Amino acid sequence: MILEGENIVINTGGRPVIPNIKGIENNKNIFLSEDIMNLEKLPKTLTIIGGGYIGLEFATIYSSFGSDVTIIQNEEEFLPREDEDIVNAIRKTLGEKGIKIITGAKITEIESSTVIYNIGEGERKLESDIILLATGRRPNTDNLCVENAGISLNERGGIKTDDHLRTDAENIWAAGDVCGKLQFTYISLDDSRIILDDMNGNRGRTINNRGAFSYSVFIQPTFSRVGMNEKEAMMNNVKYRVVKLPVMAIPKAKVLRKTEGMLKALIKEDGTILGAELFCEESHEMINFMKLAIDNNIKADVIKNFIFTHPTMSESLNDLFSM
């Protein structure tokens, strides 16, 4: 079949990364994020290889169903991109739900549904009913033969694009996960806006003026973040002060009986908000307000005195920015 068009958009998405571990191939006890929800029987025990956001979300899901869940990862540091206090809070909450986390594990082999790994000099075994591979995702560029159109790939194996998502070939754009960049549905949606504007001659919108990047990890409670955290601020020599609020202090959290977590924000001396980290119920809604504030340079004092409805989780931002 041959398809032709005046303009072409490549949006073939991504797929799970399969690590090179002996015993994975043709193992009926190993699942991916794309098929684990099709199980007809709930596993009593589940091992998740990979401690990233996908792994955490599935750990939370299956733990809430009643499975005994263990996360095992090669990296020594758990959630290395996040601030230590946030990581400690998340790890504590996961632990209280019975989710176990093993870091620094060098997995050598999988036998049926048993993970064989080394920590230090000792070999250990982790047995479970099934195993989920959650070791990241990669762009779907195999077999596209994009080189035939003069299109290049980037260092992550995604399609190389400019700020308007144009590829090396005229009138061909790429959007979403296939670009090998931020892999979120809403980023792919915004990619489509950039491309449509570009096709129509409006080149004002680019991938560089989306504003502060926000995301949510749907564990319980949800962890959401936008803008800089402390690690990034220190790395970039940005001066800041930190404000924090325990979720226990939020009236709506008490109504919901969900008082785990903390709220945190970074503020410059002039009141500019650098970033926010919200580990609480409904943070996936609250973070959008924070992105709007950061993108429009709304200062901390404005949010401090903003009139929120009551009782809501959002009104806690009054208290957070009063600290």
Say what each PLM segment does.
Residues 3-13, 48-49, 69, 126-136, ...:
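Short hydrophobic core segments
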Residues 12-72, 101, 147-149, 153-168:
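Glycine-rich dinucleotide-binding loop and its adjacent helix/turn
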Residues 14-16, 136-139, 247:
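Short glycine-rich anion-binding loops that position phosphate/pyrophosphate groups of nucleotides
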Residues 15-17, 152-154, 202-214, 238-243:
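A short alpha-helix-loop-beta-strand transition element characteristic
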Residues 16, 157-171, 252-264, 268:
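FAD-binding beta-loop-beta segment adjacent to the flavin cofactor pocket
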Residues 26-42, 125-202:
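FAD-site-proximal beta/loop scaffold in flavoenzymes
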Residues 37-38, 43-47, 53-117, 122-123, ...:
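Rossmann-like dinucleotide-binding cores of NAD(P)H-dependent redox enzymes
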Residues 218-229, 234-323:
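Flexible, glycine-rich terminal cap/loop adjacent to redox cofactors
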